[in-house]
Amino acid sequence: MGKPDIYNSSANVEKSPYYKAMQHRAPNVLTAVDKKAHGMRRRILSQGLSDSSTRAFGNTIKKHIERLCQKIEGHSDPNTQWSESYDMARWFSYLTFDIMADVVFGQPYNLLGNSEYRYVVDSIEGSNIRTGVLIQAPEAYTWRLDKRLFPASIRHRNTFVKFISSLVQERLTTKPLERDDIISHLLTAKDSETGQGFTKNEVAAESSTLIVAGTDTSSTALAATLFYLTQYPNMYRRAVAEVRSSFAKSQDVKLGRALNECVFTRACIEESMRLSPPAASALWRRVQVGGQTVDGHAIQAGCNIGVCIYAIHHNELYYPDPFVFNPDRWLQNDKQAQSAFSPFSVGPRSCIGKGFAMAELMLAVATILVKFDIRRAPGDQGCIGQGHLEGEDGRRMVDEYQLHDHVTAFKQGPVLQFRRRDTVVQSEAE
């Protein structure tokens, strides 16, 4: 496997300059090519995304998850107690944006309850179309062909940049220590090795990256998890039994030992990210002077190399029956499977927010499964998000949650209905 030869810290590579397509004004931890500059950014950011920081944000995350639950249960059929149908790709995007805006900026935008700012999610998705192409085919930037090819995507980008710039500017007018948020940390933290801090442009760049990455990737993982759980009833019943035996009611779900012991639920999330990775394409690295050997092959300097995450996640050498949803593979301490698992990338460039993201995913999935019974919407709506036998190449897997790679993933569905458990218990008693 070429993955260790490309992504480990000793590889003679650096991040491809293609990622500059994602850059605005200043480099960020995702786009910085220089290893020293990246290391400095990572050390500063890691202070604000440590395990202790994640635990401190637990109540904030849970607050928004409960708001999503309140939204869902507010529109139910009085006879059946089942809710109206919800496209969870949209609602999870609103949820994760609300969480990230609160955690990063201390700002409650409440996309879950108010449509005023929901255009921001559309702007992120629309902007990523152009960016995704430029990362894979930077030739499209020659003579600014991207302006002709992606005018709508550029408009979306400008809309998002304007929004995030005003958000940062508004936040910078308040004193850093007045709020317990990540941007307060970014404004004051210093690199432990150099003593260097972030400029205001760098704070804006890192904050924007956290918002986009935290919104898109987590919402995709949540939508994929509920897709697969409702596609595989036996797995759904096992996950439900696990979390409901650990928590009597949804309000009891919180970060800590009881949630950590829900190992099958975590396995369901990990298997969902294996089958439908939120960022599925190759993470490009450029070979430096002296070359690099990859899986026994000598690669010359200047070449861009990478491993496609979707491809390695579906390689039967690491995952027998690779297109089957099998959470049990993550309960077997299979080092082969773990070595190929890359939803958060690997090595020194791996996602700095992995711990935060997994805490968020576990809180959301466990809370929803404790509070609600879940089913697919009836009719054609219930098929949204899955493949079709008559679909184009690569889209015929009925049991696979379909994603479109635009740096992160564009998705639709699953469309679900929810029923509060306490209403079922009450009607049975009557």
Swiss-Prot record:
InterPro entries registered for this protein in UniProt: Cyt_P450, Cyt_P450_CS, Cyt_P450_E_grp-I, Cyt_P450_sf, Cytochrome_P450_monoxygenase
Which residues are heme-binding? C351
* Origin: domain of life: Eukaryota
Would you indicate the residue range of the signal peptide? none
Per UniProt, the keywords (alphabetical) are: Heme, Iron, Metal-binding, Monooxygenase, Oxidoreductase
GO MF term (any one): monooxygenase activity
Question: Coiled-coil regions in this chain?
Answer: none
Pathway linked to the protein: Mycotoxin biosynthesis
Family in the record: Belongs to the cytochrome P450 family.
Record's function text: Cytochrome P450 monooxygenase; part of the gene cluster that mediates the biosynthesis of gramillins A and B, bicyclic lipopeptides that induce cell death in maize leaves but not in wheat leaves. The nonribosomal peptide synthetase GRA1 incorporates respectively a glutamic adic (Glu), a leucine (Leu), a serine (Ser), a hydroxyglutamine (HOGln), a 2-amino decanoic acid, and 2 cysteins (CysB and CysA). The biosynthesis of 2-amino decanoic acid incorporated in gramillins could be initiated by a fatty acid synthase composed of the alpha and beta subunits FGSG_00036 and FGSG_11656.
State what protein this is by name.
Cytochrome P450 monooxygenase FGSG_15680
State the species of origin: Gibberella zeae (strain ATCC MYA-4620 / CBS 123657 / FGSC 9075 / NRRL 31084 / PH-1) (Wheat head blight fungus)
